[in-house]
């Protein structure tokens, strides 16, 4: 019997949003869901049409990471904490990907989106979940970006990543 391939079967593996990606902070989770949606949009876009979608994704990721870093600084993390360093490394790599795409490697955006889809769950479940728990513990409202009690923030700055698995 001959079976036909449907378009869904030829679409790249998309990154599903699952409850396991929730961090416990509604605003962070909303931003993360947008991040996942944009990865899926890239993977569903033909390679020759990906650059504008990727540029929008890069801009979103810059703001996504800046948002988390504002929260870190507002709640006692040092500016050079390892969570922010992870963000900087990802953004540097994403910028290099754009340059390679323009220099004729039309598959690199797809490869980057696939790599981010693999990386992101671990990051969300460790560093971001740790940050969300920290924000909650100090009474930080991520919607208003305010502290219920500013005295809850200690004078000592944290240099770790916010994860229970990072010092």
Name each model feature, range by range:
Residues 2-167:
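Small-residue-biased structural context
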């Amino acid at each position: 019997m001959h079976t036909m391939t449907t378009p869904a079967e030829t679409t790249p593996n998309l990154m599903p949003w699952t409850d396991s990606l929730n961090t416990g902070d509604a605003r962070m989770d909303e931003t993360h869901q947008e991040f996942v949606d944009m990865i899926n949009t890239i993977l569903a876009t033909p390679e020759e049409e990906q650059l504008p979608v990727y540029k929008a994704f890069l801009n979103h990721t810059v703001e996504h990471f800046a948002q988390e870093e504002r929260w870190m600084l507002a709640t006692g993390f040092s500016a050079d904490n390892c969570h922010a360093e992870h963000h900087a490394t990802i953004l540097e790599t994403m910028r290099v990907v754009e340059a390679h795409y323009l220099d004729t490697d039309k598959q690199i955006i797809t490869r980057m989106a696939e790599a981010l889809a693999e990386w992101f769950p671990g990051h969300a479940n460790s560093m971001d979940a740790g940050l969300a728990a920290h924000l909650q513990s100090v009474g930080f409202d991520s919607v208003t970006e305010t502290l219920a009690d500013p005295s809850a923030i200690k004078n000592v700055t944290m240099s770790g990543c916010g994860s229970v698995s990072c010092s």
